[in-house]
């Protein structure tokens, strides 16, 4: 909008700690202000106070606090706020009730069924936002024309629907009145398939408003997209947060005369667009604050740097936000914040828990930064409030922060300066731990000075912050060195040069208002109105007219809404989007056609097909031309151009830059004299050679040695970053370098995983995330394994080591291996492992290996899905690969691997693979993931040298070994102190009676143990046999859980233990034994036995509840959650995957739209968790109604033996598999069976609960009590970090 002459424009970023005010004053000059967001002794509202102060300063008239401000001189107010974010983090929103379709009362509690932390035995409870749940009697399903079905109705997607049950409003009325009587006035209404049939939600909403509910969020209005779980979470967040936001808005308006009636007031949404205050809702507000910063650098740095892609680096007190801009905003449509999944357009902002307030630890030989934070109170040690040592303290010790440049607001009276002495004292305690380790550790080394320790922590913090940047760039096919680093936030300037140098970037751009760039972004942002509706059309010429009609209607809505806000049509632009995916896949992309004009073979709005293919190829590296393209949603984004034009011209330099003073800063080579400049005294053209410090009122910029800063013609700081010199690291163990390599190795495995997820085609890998990626040393020992699927953890290294021994010298450059055989380290046949040996110039043998293991949905065998319940030989379970060259001499062996995948069809009663296309596509994706790993390790070797990288592969394994030895010693010492023997044992049984026996003997002096499984049952005539690699996976998983903190996950974890497994037993069967159940069932029992021996927690559900459904037309496989075991200090979580799996479950609406089933019920199974001082988690009940004839297979455990309790805790309930025939007969299927089902049959799955812990008659201890079992740390809290807008 135009700027009325002589009036103020305010842009305000209300952060968690500080509020930044950016004002364009009459005449065009700029005034900025920073004040505390909370200061009740002086003012009620920080944004109002900021406006008052600037008006008072500019007008020269006293404006008393508490009196409504005159708005005649105010043209506009724009605000970004963390009000919604803070309410979500602190759970201070409105009291909410959830109204959901009957049978789904616990759907949002169960969610995806995956647990957030793979190795946390105390699985945190889901933090749902609703207080009560009402089930609504109604049901809509997709129409399939079964006999007896009523007339279909058409949903707004175009799908035909069957109304099985209309809404029973009378039954609902009394329940709603009861909610009102209990003080609940906000509702979230979430009904099945309401994205396409909104009428039922609308009827419920109308009734609720008539009864007096003050806020009702209908999921079909908040975000009308398929997938009820994220849509439901989004509706709940909206109902929880919108009343809080509206109360804040109303309170803000009361601070002005006329309640801002004649002032344009706009709020920043999570998608980077502004919205009128009356349309500002909770589900769109969670990233309101961070979004302003992205808009800020996109409108400044990107254009000032000639359109070069930009990485935004916003470092605050407790976390760092990174984002990317390359000419258009990058949005995601589903993301989690504070434990809540939101399905709404949001800028793609990645957060890492490393900021100025991140705490510093030295643990088992590693420098560790975060994720714990000192917070605002007590804050870092230098705040003089007894806080812990943090990154800020390390920078202060190094001389990179100057106490004199900060106000005296610290200490108990908030009237003292920063304290370098407190920082040094706190860091000295950590330095003592470091030097004690260096003196007495496994590799004695010279001690480190206090400054060297501080420098080490800063380097590790920098590497931690590089990881999400690599994920935004390298993992998506972008070169990080081709980007400019835009640095903002209070703490970022101290680290920008080092971050850019580590990523190979040439330029750092720091805006002159970088300390309040989010507020500047608000001033420069446009007003946005979006309209979206679901769709279910194929993208074909026959549907183009319908798509154009829908897009035109949505465009008209956007234009009308913006014109109502005062924008002339000439200032309004629109952009159309289609949410497209290949049929049969779950990965949809929201694509715009603005760079693909319409052709004769496209809709009038543009060639979305060409845009989709181009984007799909860029994102995933392949396309699927034989599959039709489907439109899931149509969307139009309308923009009213209103950003202010800044005319604040910087002064021209008239001489050399003035040095305020010279200080001493510590760098890699020691202390150096470092000039200090004041940003306000620098002018255009000034050039500053590093090292130097540039200080302004809001931030400190460190220009490191070898870098050069200049002041641009816009008054910004551009730093030319010198190339990183060759690494000075050598092969000797350096704890600092070890910590950095730990991050680098893990980053490699993580990026391999992202590439595999991106390039795979199958639901199992792309959506259920049933895969793992890892890096291995030249001996095949595991170096780094990203935490994907636990059952893969220890098994993959057995696979790599088998190939090394089996092939010997028959490994050549360009070879890629494929294996799945249990005797070669395989888990079960559908888990195909792809291994790439990596050669290096001058080396005759591979210098390392990378591998990826993925679960393929079908590789043949006697049943669809290759998970037969009654297999007795390995051949019945599918195609077998002992050692197969998938790629030879750089050529993909498609013909040979196709023949091998079809080979099971030659065996009587078996079939070859039923989905060859997906097999081949996923195998290529695994090869591509391995190639990414090779590239990244090659870069690491190029930086450090082969000898150093291989040495640190060994050091990182030794570090994991040390952590496990420390844990074993702590466990043994604890038992010894209580007069207990150093030998522990446990025994449990499979449902067929086969025992799993374990005896553990601890060697206290060595910190080692013998795990002896002698006494375990013999190999069985069935498929519960678990290959040796499975037992090792279970063991490494348990050891990692028992350590209780983040450690490198590698072969070193097994070094302190000797494992005895009897040959020919159920845990080490013969090569041809059937094993499919061993991987998914016996593995869980092995974990229960190990954890039971250590007394760490009670038994989990002990099962993955494998369900397979298939016929000639389709195939479907799922694993289903149950109850987690309770432990010393925590209740077991209900409805969650535990231990050896963590795969997601298909969303109910996707399930019903893709497969011939109706999910009638999916909820918790009350009372199935074992009673105890701490109660075991409940299992779930899942009921499937079949709509076609199909073969149902179930492969389950804990149907005979209950999950045990510990220390007086009662066992969890057994599972139960029932089939209810259409004629009413109920049949118990038992634990393992295949059965033909017919339309109208119902499968009822009751999964087991977890065991209880402690005598149920003992009261649970109050919060904060010491753990009952002191050998292991108490864990289980999900720490949420408030995003700091400003920090030291």
Swiss-Prot record:
Tagged with keyword Oxidoreductase: no
Pfam families, per the entry: Hydant_A_C, Hydant_A_N, Hydantoinase_A, Hydantoinase_B
Q: Where in the cell is it found?
A: Cytoplasm, Cytosol
Q: Which GO terms describe its molecular function?
A: 5-oxoprolinase (ATP-hydrolyzing) activity; ATP binding; identical protein binding
- Positions of region (Disordered): 1248-1270
Q: Which GO terms describe its cellular component?
A: cytosol
Broad class of the protein's primary localization: cytoplasm
- The protein's Enzyme Commission number: 3.5.2.9
Q: Which reaction does it catalyse?
A: 5-oxo-L-proline + ATP + 2 H2O = L-glutamate + ADP + phosphate + H(+)
**Expression sites (tissue/organ):** Expressed in testis, kidney and liver.
Recite the UniProt keywords alphabetically: ATP-binding, Cytoplasm, Hydrolase, Nucleotide-binding, Phosphoprotein
Which InterPro entries does the record match to this protein? ACX-like_C, Hydant_A_N, Hydantoinase_A, Hydantoinase_B, Oxoprolinase-like
Question: Which terms under GO biological process does the entry name?
Answer: glutathione metabolic process
Residues that bear Phosphoserine:
1265
Q: Which family does it belong to?
A: Belongs to the oxoprolinase family.
> What is the protein's quaternary organization?
Homodimer.
Q: Which PANTHER family match?
A: 5-OXOPROLINASE, 5-OXOPROLINASE RELATED
Its biological purpose: Catalyzes the cleavage of 5-oxo-L-proline to form L-glutamate coupled to the hydrolysis of ATP to ADP and inorganic phosphate.
In Swiss-Prot or TrEMBL terms, this protein is called 5-oxoprolinase
Specify the species. Rattus norvegicus
